[in-house]
């Protein structure tokens, strides 16, 4: 059952009404929506690898990889393809459904894109879904990635249009929207979400969801990131972690507004109790990253994730016998 047609005309006021519903009503509506489109007992698991770390020319105020800030992070060159494929193979053995590769660039140079395309093709040969995040893309670059077999491209809007300029000045929101359009036009699935806990208001979080839901096509994946603490960046001065109920409400609104999108409970899970993560899954989140490092910041250990899923009676490709391989895989490339 697919339910009502997807909407692309949400208003901020409608989002506010949903968010303010009595909590039991909001959770019921979100879970009912979730069940119309997904198996509520199934969780998608992905693995994330930084294939080129640090030295980014953008000034994103939350990011440890920006060259504008002294975060103590050493910039690296693009990883060797053999090392990337070996990491992907271990991630698959450990239970990952999808392998995501991230490079700290404003936009990829052609010679670098050639190497990334080769990586994508090689990972696809392992039988995994592929995702990359490389910064802004032109239409020809998106077409090259599609030809290489890329499944998903991640390019977040980060926050609401109103709060955006307080966080980033070197790339406009329209730059991001243009890249999303180029990716979609090339036939690649879109992964696009944002970050909460940077000092924005609830209205900004809802504004971000309205922006995403009103794109010409809903993102196929919507990652909701809680800001990971990073020393030396401007967001340190404004950051305020949302309480658990606020996070669950936001997940629920995302599920209702974008009913067929995968909603990923992404960065920041190490700050969440098992009970809060369970509440977010009940609200409609149905994907996580596995492994104990996300790019440059911490993530819950795989043993904890596997144990939680067992206690919840949920299933994923992550199994108790494979968690050691997950942690070994990610730690070797931290």
UniProtKB/Swiss-Prot annotation:
- Ranges for domain Radical SAM core come to 41-260
Q: How is the cofactor bound?
A: Binds 1 [4Fe-4S] cluster. The cluster is coordinated with 3 cysteines and an exchangeable S-adenosyl-L-methionine.
Q: Which reaction does it catalyse?
A: (4R,5S)-dethiobiotin + (sulfur carrier)-SH + 2 reduced [2Fe-2S]-[ferredoxin] + 2 S-adenosyl-L-methionine = (sulfur carrier)-H + biotin + 2 5'-deoxyadenosine + 2 L-methionine + 2 oxidized [2Fe-2S]-[ferredoxin]
Enzyme class (EC, first level):
transferase
Which keywords has UniProt assigned to this entry? 2Fe-2S, 4Fe-4S, Biotin biosynthesis, Iron, Iron-sulfur, Metal-binding, S-adenosyl-L-methionine, Transferase
UniProt binding sites for [2Fe-2S] cluster: 100, 131, 191, 264
Name the CDD domains on file: Radical_SAM
PROSITE patterns from the xrefs? RADICAL_SAM
| Binding residues for [4Fe-4S] cluster | 56, 60, 63
Write down the EC number.
Answer: 2.8.1.6
Q: Which Pfam families match?
A: BATS, Radical_SAM
Q: In which pathway does it act?
A: Cofactor biosynthesis; biotin biosynthesis; biotin from 7,8-diaminononanoate: step 2/2
InterPro entries from the xrefs? Aldolase_TIM, BATS_dom, Biotin_synth/BioAB, Biotin_synthase, Elp3/MiaA/NifB-like_rSAM, rSAM
Q: What does this protein need as cofactor?
A: [4Fe-4S] cluster; [2Fe-2S] cluster
What are this entry's molecular-function GO terms?
Answer: 2 iron, 2 sulfur cluster binding; 4 iron, 4 sulfur cluster binding; biotin synthase activity; iron ion binding
Q: Which GO BP terms, alphabetically?
A: biotin biosynthetic process
- What job does the chain carry out? Catalyzes the conversion of dethiobiotin (DTB) to biotin by the insertion of a sulfur atom into dethiobiotin via a radical-based mechanism.
**Family, similarity comment:** Belongs to the radical SAM superfamily. Biotin synthase family.
According to the record's subunit comment, the protein's assembly and interactions are: Homodimer.
Task: Give the protein name, as stated in the record.
Answer: Biotin synthase
Q: Which gene encodes it?
A: bioB
């Amino acid at each position: 059952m697919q339910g009502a047609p997807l909407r692309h005309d949400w208003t901020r006021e409608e989002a506010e009404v949903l968010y303010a519903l009595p909590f039991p009503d909001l959770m019921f509506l979100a879970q009912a929506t979730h069940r119309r489109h997904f198996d509520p007992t199934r969780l998608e698991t992905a693995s994330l690898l930084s294939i080129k770390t640090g030295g980014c020319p953008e000034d994103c105020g939350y990011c440890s990889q920006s060259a504008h800030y002294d975060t103590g992070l050493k910039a690296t060159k693009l990883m060797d393809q053999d090392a990337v494929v070996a990491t992907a193979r271990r991630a698959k053995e450990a239970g990952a459904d999808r392998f995501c590769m991230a490079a700290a660039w404003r936009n990829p140079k052609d010679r670098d894109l050639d190497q990334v395309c080769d990586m994508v093709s090689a990972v696809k040969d392992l039988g995994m879904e592929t995702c990359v995040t490389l910064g802004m893309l032109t239409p020809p670059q998106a077409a090259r990635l599609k030809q290489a077999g890329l499944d998903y491209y991640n390019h977040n809007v980060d926050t609401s249009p109103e709060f955006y300029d307080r966080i980033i000045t070197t790339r406009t929101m329209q730059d991001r929207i243009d890249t999303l359009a180029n990716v979609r036009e090339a036939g690649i699935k879109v992964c696009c979400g944002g970050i909460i806990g940077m000092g924005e208001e609830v209205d900004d979080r809802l504004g971000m969801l309205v922006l995403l839901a009103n794109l010409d096509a809903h993102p196929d994946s919507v990652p909701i990131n809680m800001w990971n603490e990073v020393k030396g960046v401007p967001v340190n001065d404004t950051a305020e972690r949302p309480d658990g109920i606020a996070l669950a409400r936001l997940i629920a609104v995302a599920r209702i507004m974008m009913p067929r999108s995968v909603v990923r409970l992404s960065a920041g899970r190490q700050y969440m109790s098992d009970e809060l993560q369970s509440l977010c899954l009940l609200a409609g989140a149905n994907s996580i990253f596995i492994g104990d490092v996300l790019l440059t910041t911490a993530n819950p250990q795989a043993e904890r994730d596997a144990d939680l899923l067992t206690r919840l009676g949920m299933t994923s490709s992550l199994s108790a016998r494979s968690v050691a391989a997950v942690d070994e895989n990610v730690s070797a490339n931290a």
